Curated annotation (Swiss-Prot):
SMART domains xrefs: DEXDc (SM00487), HELICc (SM00490)
Induction conditions: Expressed in the late phase of the viral replicative cycle.
Localisation per UniProt entry: Host membrane; Virion
Record protein name field: Putative RNA Helicase B962L
Lipid bilayer topology: Single-pass membrane protein
Transmembrane segments: 521-541
Species for this entry: African swine fever virus (isolate Pig/Kenya/KEN-50/1950) (ASFV)
Domain Helicase C-terminal positions: 253-459
Catalytic reaction(s) noted: ATP + H2O = ADP + phosphate + H(+)
Amino acid sequence: MGKPTLLEPGHLYNVPAEHKNDIPIHYIITWIKQRLPEFGGSIPTSLADRVLIIKSRTGSGKSTALPVHVFRILRNENTHSFQKYLGRSVICTQPRVLTAVTLAKDIGASTHYPDMILGQTVGYQTKPLTEKPNRGLIYATAGVLLAQLHTMTDDEIASRYAFMIIDEAHERALGIDLMLMYIKSMLERMLQRGSIGALRIPFVILTSATIDTYKYSTYFGIGKENIILVEGRQFGVETHWPLYNTNNYIKTACETALTIHKENIHDRPTEADILIFMPGMGEIRFLSMLLSHANMDLAKEKLPLMLILPIDSEAIAQENEAYLGLKAEIKDLWVKNPLTAKVEKPLRRVIVSTVVAETGLTIETLKYVIDPGWNRSVETYYPEWAGGLITRPAAQSRIEQRKGRVGRVFPGHFYPLYTKHVFEQIPAQQYPEIITEGPGAIFLNIVVETIKKNKEGVFKVQEIDMLDPPPTDALASALERAIVGGLLTRGEKGLQLTQLGDIASRFSFLSIEEARMCFSGYFWQAAISDIATILAVVSVVDKKLTNLLDSKQRNGAMLAEAVLAGIPPFLQNMDNAYSNIHLLLADDLLEGLFIFEGFQHAIIYFINNKVNNLAKHLREWCEKKMLKYSAMVQILARREDILNELAVVGLNPFHQWQNRLASANAETFLKRVCTLKQCFYEAYRLNCFCYDEQRLLYTGRNGIHFSYQDTVIKNPSCIVTPKMMLSPVSKQYMEWRLEPSFVSVLDGFVNVDINFLLPRQEIPNILGGGVEDEEEEPPLPIQAFLHKYVKTNFHFSGKSFKELKMKPHQTIKFPETTLINIIPDIPKNVVQTYLEISVCHQYSFKRLIYCETFYTDMDDVQQENSVELIGLPMAAHHLTMHDFNKLYQLLKPDGFLIVYDFHKSQEAFWLHSLQDALGHHTIRRDMDFHTISEWETIFKECGFTPMFNKQPSEHELFIVFKK
């Protein structure tokens, strides 16, 4: 096996002529040492003394040899292994978990680096996996270093790391762009401190095979002398361009792999593997199935078989059978013959992978790469803030990375499934996520870092210092969400963080909406663990709750068993339990909460019974409930992350633990439902949509509209969704439609500010970053109580904001809007439906009551403006005058709807009840109650203004009134 290019002389470019034939790694190490005071260099005075860019072809050793040799600057390679290293570390970031783990293990096992011992001098640190020394060479995902830069001081970072190597720096993920922003700001701050700070400034090395050296050098303000180019590769790669493009790349990929296999039947197993890139798991599963069928044909022809290994991030995190097959030696692997069921040695592995195998990964037995040329990533469109997974042609830089998987240990072959002409037409570089996705969850981090550089402590858009700033429309949308969420406000000199914003900016992985929802949980006294669970479900589950189902035929009814596993005990014996729960909750988010509660119950049950192999039992439980085990584990991990985030900033993650929805009883259930829905509304109010009766569509503030139809609930008047999603309509023509990801119905649960849902107002000057012209602040759609909470409902002790205390707010009381506390036995049989009232949009109702027995066919009721009602079976037999009066007092501040029945058997009861509720005003029993004018007279005499929606029928009348 040849040496990596970095260890072979004669590959240097963009260096002085006398050094062109140097061994690249020696030249690089010498270049670095010349700028280190401990090796005779001068004290750094600019970024040029601490930033180096290395552009080197794939397979050149920049991910392996370079970090090791840089570490040897700090620790001599001849140092005895028993001597513990106590100096500063070298961190080498990787964009993916697979590469971080694999590189560390490979170096620790390599005979070329006897001084690098896994767990002692080399290791890895990722979110799910960690095996690292306290000090040494540490391979880590970019997110690990990003979190450290976010939470640690400059001096703490400098004390930990002497070198930061950002491998695959061309990747433009949000986290990597933010990490580079943090690094640049840190270096500048330490340089400004003079020699005291400059002596320990970490050295930053950016490496990539396809990096735009001009863009990055301009960003860091360094010259050409800080750029080292290493050209050439040890072994050649032959590209096999097709004559024509394919219109079915999955089928073509299978055919190409089978052709390679048959035509190279004499390949040595150590030089035979095939890697096929696919954009997503759906394609991976389909291609794996086709390859399995191909194995059947090979078995019939008595030819050697292929071992098919589907690899994605989930396989790596779980270290499943496919991942273990990837890491094992080919001689230790077996494949089952589909005809004889006997096991035999495979000729080669066919690795079908997503982009997790695109960078930094060396498979020493890999000889062929098949690339369909597609890439799938999240894209977000503004101002709708609608996003989805969009499949587009991969950029040339990504294709070069894929091609670079071969030719590392021996000559390789690259099979693109597109013509050379197509390759030449696609973009050279991938679009950064800050452009395609917008700032998203890192917006507040950008704000804080920008404020740090501003002398007046305000946020100005023009001062954002990133490789690429967010697009204007994305930035305007993010600003609006931060202001509406109470995290940003306009001060005397410009935009500033509020106290809530300061707390939210300390979160590492929470978006504006997620932070706002957590804060709302404290405002409204919700169980924060429920909030964390719901946010975790939204984060993990793509598009719809039914995507939690591990079944090709997904529908809402299949969720029933999973939802019922987590509902409160008092609801479990109800007839038609799932249908009634679905009607009662009218909420995908709460159903997701119950699904997780069921999973959590299973965990506790298995632990209490001390079962062996907990994961196996949980997997079987998920299979029984038709749930994806991997998704449930991800929700569990994400939930833990959110709770940890809250604890880190000093908030109690188990606030109101006793008020969890799953532990509610008949008296508290609907109140807790209303509390959680209020939190949804506070967090996602910009994603509220109202039903337009004329267009039969839901419309929002930004003019977008979409069709939504629940399987049971018909046209609720107001819904909220965490995010709008783009769903493919036609793959052939690349068409998408807008649809809500999760739906929470607000009717009857929450007072919705209708004015807030009007088309959004323009916000002039907000992008100008200041108010120098002293113009009056434009009106913003911000609910007044947000400001009150920021100013009066929080106070902090200490400068670190570690303690957050609530102050009661007398003007904001959570209304008890049900009959639960009046008649405890009724909720067991509560049935919810929707009744259209033409005047209801003029008032904000909480919860409205009617007798279920009076409506046998709700489909006959005219659908106009939806108001939520609670059906109470035989309510007239239970509701006393005292109960009626108590109910009226609960609902009085916001109006009340009476559904009045005229059956003679109940007439006297209702008259007396109504008379008592209205303050003992006399109601004449001899009136003709079938005329609206008579009712209008009664209510005017009582000091009320009645609104009637229609002429009463023979037995029914609907009345809306407000005092």
